[in-house]
Amino acid sequence: QSTDDSVLFLKEKFPDVNVIINPSNEGFSTGYNLALKQVNAEYYVLLNSDVEVTENWIEPIITLLDSNKKIAACQPKVLDYNLRSRFEYAGASGGFIDKYGYPYCRGRIFNVLEEDKGQYNNAEEVFWSTGACMFVRAEAFWKVGGFDDDYFAHMEEIDVCWRMKNIGYQ
């Protein structure tokens, strides 16, 4: 449970926002699963609290999802907040799995972050989208049972994307 005044702040400043208070911190996967069960939407936008978005950032991705019903999850480029010319470590521009089962992503090789020179401005199929800023089709998400609650934090987005791919989604 939150130990700062963030819940009070939300209730006072944003009274129309439905605040979900869980009795304990069960982790990223369980927390999102519990929250998303209360949301009636075609798409979910999962956004970490430390991600800053730009104006009109949602529309192009919703247009992409609307254009192809086989797309289960996607993301925008995620750039480093402090060094905006470089990709962010967590997910950068979507990821893949190598032949040894190791996840990697566009915009980052191991701990080396690439400079954003527009090389990933194209819409391209990736194996997984980052949970830091993930758009996901609700129908596909629930067809695979949502996030696996065994993942407290990290790699849950790779797992759910893998399971959605296994049933025919991109």
List each language-model region with its residue ranges:
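Acidic metal-phosphate-binding loop of nucleotide-sugar-dependent transferases
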Residues: E26, V51-E52, V78, Y151
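A conserved acidic beta->alpha catalytic loop
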Residues: Q1-L8, S24
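Short aromatic/hydrophobic "clamp" motif used to bind/position activated sugar donors
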Residues: Y44
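Short, flexible, basic/aromatic active-site loop/helix in glycosyltransferases
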Residues: P76, G94-V126
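A short, conserved alpha-helix in the catalytic core of glycosyltransferases
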Residues: N121, F127-Q170
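Alpha-helical elements of Rossmann-like donor-binding domains used by nucleotide-donor carbohydrate transfer enzymes
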Residues: D5, F9, T30, L34, ...
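Conserved donor NDP-sugar-binding/catalytic core segment of glycosyltransferases
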Residues: E52-Y102
